[in-house]
């Protein structure tokens, strides 16, 4: 009987120690996940194409949330001659975009041995979202997933839906969608792009 009692107590102690170890690892990886996401935002701030106008990160124990507000830089809009674009496309490109990210962190995030897994929802302002539906048939056609390994390296997968748009003025836009993958080393010291870019056709107004 004493043997059974000792075995039971030892089993309980092992379970408690395992639970504490797991909770500690989840908390620690939550800190490291925030470091990784903050680094990605810092890289966006350094971009010559995009400016970050707002950023907030809320860290939880098992899951965290981040939100960044970005927009194309005025110099980019000038370079692409935004004034010649269709009015709906001008509205979309000139307005800020909200990147709402949910981050799952821990040794078994997304059923894998990871630092974190992040899924980002690209949210346009309400007026722009209504116009986007005219192009993509859905209001949120852009999807991003970020898989961060324990080492800090990882990959970002993103997809953009297809477009088939026409106006009576003669404007036409056809685009078969976009798929891409960015594989990166820790702190983005090295990274490689893999893009699948289909044919793009656009006819502007005369």
Region spans (language model):
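Hydrophobic membrane-insertion alpha-helices, especially the h-region
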Residues: 8-26
């Amino acid at each position: 009987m004493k043997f059974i009692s000792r075995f039971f107590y030892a089993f309980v102690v092992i379970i408690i120690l395992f639970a504490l170890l797991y909770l500690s690892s989840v908390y620690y990886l939550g800190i490291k996940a925030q470091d990784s996401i903050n680094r990605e935002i810092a890289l966006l701030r350094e971009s010559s194409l995009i400016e970050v106008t707002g950023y907030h990160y809320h860290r939880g124990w098992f899951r965290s949330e981040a939100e960044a507000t970005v927009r194309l830089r005025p110099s980019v809009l000038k370079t692409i001659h935004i004034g010649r674009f269709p009015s709906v496309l001008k509205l979309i490109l000139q307005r800020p975009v909200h990147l709402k990210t949910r981050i799952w962190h821990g040794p078994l995030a997304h059923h894998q041995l990871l630092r974190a897994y992040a899924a980002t929802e690209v949210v346009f302002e309400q007026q722009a979202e209504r116009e986007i539906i005219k192009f993509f048939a859905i209001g949120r056609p852009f999807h991003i997933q970020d898989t961060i390994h324990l080492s800090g390296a990882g990959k970002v997968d993103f997809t953009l839906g297809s477009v088939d748009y026409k106006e009576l003025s003669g404007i036409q836009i056809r685009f078969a969608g976009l798929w891409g993958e960015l594989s990166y080393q820790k702190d983005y010291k090295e990274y490689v792009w893999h893009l699948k870019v289909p044919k793009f056709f656009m006819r502007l107004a005369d």
